[in-house]
Amino acid sequence: MTKCKVIALANQKGGTAKTTTTLNLGIGLAHQGRKVLLVDADPQGDLTTALGWTNADSLPITLETQMKKILQDEPFVYNEGILHHEEGVDIIPTNIELSGMEISLVNAMSREQTLKLYLADLKKDYDYILIDCMPSLGMLTINALAAADSVIVPVQAHYLPLKGMTQLMKTIGKVQRHLNPNLKIDGVLLTLADMRTKLARTTEDSLRENYGKHIRIFKAIIPVAITAAESSAAGQSIYEYDKNGTVAKAYAEFTREVIQCGEKQRNKHESSLSR
């Protein structure tokens, strides 16, 4: 198995299709033969619910219980509590109890590294680990960025969400300087886009003009469609729910771009080591 790549999907702005993107990227990677673990790091538990586990509050083992054991220096089985979805991905589930972890982390030693410590042994079992971050820049998101090799930023195709990019980029920069110097930005993904509208086209132009010289703007654009929400409600990926639709095709294209991005980074790294 090749080296596992950990990707955080982050944006402090809600409503950017971040969870939908995590789910469909993960299952898209599984369709390409990759072993994938999804980490639901949002106390809302939307990723857990979207994969069909509507009883998250009654699950005995979640991300919160495992992180708590690390904080309290208690022994734990690293792969305990992981659930398997019929479309080929595994998930570390979450429920609202994770919200208390923000407070617990504030005064903890090595507080930014707790999630990284948890994922360390899991990495040997997977090609990709995708972390669905909460829509804030609190300690859980900092933990995700500290644990990740790279970050993908989903952005809604409206003007105002672009304004939040500045703060997110500052946070990523701080994490790179102080916690994770190897953290890379894989790119920005435009989501919920109706490219028939002037607003969406203007947003894309603005995104490419302001950030495109320094950051990859993925060629794939995820269109707005009711089928994306319906698939989550059905506990399925968009490929299973509407495999011939525009959203499924867009996510398949995005998945290919992510794989190509990873291969380029790996080849570049191996080339630098051989010099």
What are these regions (language model features)?
Residues M1-R275:
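P-loop NTP-binding core
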